Amino acid sequence: MKKYSISVLLLFISLAAIAQRTVQSTVFDANNGMPLEMVTVRLLKAADSTLVQGAQTNSNGWFSLQRVNPGKYVLIVSSVGYNDYRENITIERKDIILKNIQLKENVQALKELEVKGTAAQLVVKGDTLEYNATAFKVQENAVVEDLLKKLPGVEITNEGKITVNGQEIKKIRVDGKKFFDGDIEMATKNLPAEMIDKIQVLEQKSEMAQLTGFEDDETERIINFTTKSNRRKGVFGNVVGGGGLDTENQVRYDANANINFMDGDSQTSLVAGANNVNTARSRRGRGSWGANNGITETQNIGLNNNTIVNEKFKFGGDGSFNHSNNFSETNSTKESYLRGSIFNDSTYNTAVNDNYEANIRLEGEWKPDSMTTIIFQPNINYNTGTSQSYRDYIYLQDMDTTSLGDARNAGNSQSVSGGLRLIVNRKFPSKPGRSLTANVSSGFSQSESQNFNYSNKQSDSITVINQYTRNTSDRFNVDARISFVEPLWNNKNVLETVLAFSSTTQNSIKDQYASDNLTAFDNRNPEDYNKFVEDYSNNFENRFFRETMELNYRYTEKKYNLMLGMKAEPSQTFSRTYYGNGESTPFENKVINFAPNGRFQYNFGKKEFLRVDYRGNTRQPSVNQMQPVKNNEDLMRETVGNPGLNPSFSNFMRLMYSSFNEQTFSSFSTWFSGNIVKDELVTNRIYDSSGKQYTQTVNSDKLPVSLNGNIMFNTPIIQKRLHFNTSTNVGYNTNYGYTKNNMNVNIDSLIAITNLPLGDMSFTRRYSFQEQLSLTFTHDKVEVGARGLFRYSNTLNNLSERLSETFDWTIRGNVVFRLPYDVTLNSDINYSNRLGYSNFDQQEVIWNASVDKSILKNRGVLSLKCFDILRQQLNIRQSVGDNSVSYTKYNTLTSYFMVSFSYRIRQFGGSTRDDNSRMRDSRYGSGMRPEGPRPPDGGGHWMH
């Protein structure tokens, strides 16, 4: 019987394979009879226009669609500059060789394409901003970050944060797929710019929201890079190596490799690099310091994969290893406002941080049938690092010195974390639109750290601490969410019912020891610290539970859609603290939050829309904020946790409008948002007579308000060769806190520091304005770009009634000359001027230049680059708190030059034909190929 069953099964498999057929043909230009390369071919189901398979013609105009099941289909053949070709075909029991397909020219499209530079820089498609990458020229060996810096409305900070028209980008996708789990710098600083066709800025829904059609709290603003169609089958990448010297005769080097293996929708990318020029090509392994705070040396290697196994199963993931070493040197000033008094402090700090990190993430999507989708996502992370720092400081009250001192710290840490998410979605064939979705996830983390601290402070007396602290913590969480979607009287009216549960268990142990041996810090041996410090040691256990009950309604019309919902979120917190003296204190807290949520979107057309949305969200305090134990590692700032904290609850509302004019290629978009937070987590600061502050996180009884907005306009002018862009940002923010001066806090009393007295209410209100203008001129032989930025900030604190204003002016210009013999000259210059930054008001002019020579039949590029030729680069930051304004100046990389060589790996469609030859033979060049695939809207879910 068993053998019979196996035989029958094999027979069915064989019959299914035999039933699959091949469709092939050749595409020609109807006017000259020449075969057409890189023409897009799509096969759709005749019943519902579902895409079954796609292909592109080769250099002979030939295409083949493999393993097509019998049935009725629509074949669509399209290429820019030609009219589409459509043919209804029926596949039965034999292969089909269609007659030659003749594409006729689209006269109107050709007129537009004949004028070079007519491609719009920016197109608005609903809620998606789409930049045309080929409208922006970059160096031959440029990476994606170089391309992003040229896009109107895009800003990249020194820390690598990307904002588009004032909105922060959270993650990166490539062709709709995860690339190193959204690690922004892994994509922007490794991928070659010339592979990119479109840059799409959009809001990415979570996997569950894509399956249910109802948005949740996990929607993020992302960038999706679509690759050029001729880069989707083959091997391509860049290998770059360079070396040079800086002004201090220190060797500077930069080596990087990125190789991509593409097979349609399946892709594998290998990245590796090492440098000491502050180019952090991954956010992983960085530790707590910023990308450009000081001098950084990094090494990284990673592998990313997305594989379409078959129609039912997709698999992907990534693994990476990163190491970084950072040396930072900072000078900072801080002005703290108290009632009737002002504290000023000046600090000098040096630090060395060394960090290693390894990550593995896997992901799979299985569709056992057309009604069921299963997604699983495991991940694990390991991190270890060491740190050393030295700090000296001086504090003044009303310009009189109150204390001064120095501190030395050294430590190490290790942590491991992981998680697993499982999503199951089931549609019901008995009623279209009905679905049941379950999302279950769990995660854990464990960490251990050791810190050695030697500090002394001089005020009215001298205080010295010589201590060793060991911290261990572990965390485990389980989350479950079930959604049932039910169409009402028709598919335009849909109701979603959601039940969710979240549980988090945390345990944190802190043991502190002191030593009278003054050499103990230099030895850094825990055994030298033999005095257990009860007041600064404890064991904290915390359990947090949250239940969510949610009801959402969605109404959809062709022109508009509406979603309304209500959510109730009860939460319970149970904690117990075991102190070093053996005593323990329990704590229990229960709260409930109610929040409506809604969204309304009106589509005036495919290129114009208006949206209004609102959402409420709960944020749980961290263990460090809740753990009720004193921390004296900083003699001028002692902290203690607050186990009585409530979760904060934010109310967020936003208005968005976008439009695109197809006649003028002009784009307009604007957004305004507001956020009000209930029970916001703020800081309570108590100052003693020496300027030392005791701090504790508390819930604010005021409602912090944040209002922000942006207006963007982009249009081509002067025969569409010159592009103009303006982006305006406005903001209003209030920060609350509590502050009290000259209070005598009994440091030896555990009860006193745990129940820190509440200070006077302090708040800082801040107005901000930013205007950015840009012009770009593009020609075959020359490109000129100019960008101007003005930023204004106005800050007022209620305790000092003192106004703080800062002004920033930045003018950026770049020029590219393409000379004979494959030589390119590049130069960019940035002028910036700062006013209002305390002692750091300075001007700087940053001038970079390079000359590139293409060799080896355009596969290699030899470059000479000079960075910061005038030696003026600064690194200054401003930070505004509820009762303070601070300014920090970091050390930065000095001027240097570098000679480098880059080699481009190109092998497409089984041919080793040079990529530049391909583009010279192409009828319209690189900027005129069909668009890449758009990310899925509500229906797809492979872009996570």
Predicted feature residues:
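Short Pro-Gly-centered beta-turn/loop motif in secreted/extracellular proteins
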Residues: L36-E37, S64-K72, V80
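Short, ordered, surface-exposed loop/turn motifs in non-cytosolic proteins
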Residues: N31-K45, L122-V124
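Outer-membrane beta-barrel translocator domains and adjoining extracellular loop/strand segments
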Residues: T212-G213, R281-G287, F327-N344, V352, ...
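A short, solvent-exposed loop/turn motif at the edges and junctions
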Residues: K45-T50, K72-N88
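Membrane-proximal, glycine/serine-rich, low-complexity loop/turn segments characteristic
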Residues: Q20, N60-W62, I76, N83, ...
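Outer membrane beta-barrel strand-and-loop segments of large Gram-negative receptors
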Residues: Y348, N477-D479, K531-S537, V640, ...
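Short, acidic Ser/Thr/Gly-rich low-complexity loop/linker segments typical of extracellular
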Residues: A46-W62
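Signature of Gram-negative outer-membrane beta-barrel scaffolds
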Residues: V494-E608, N797
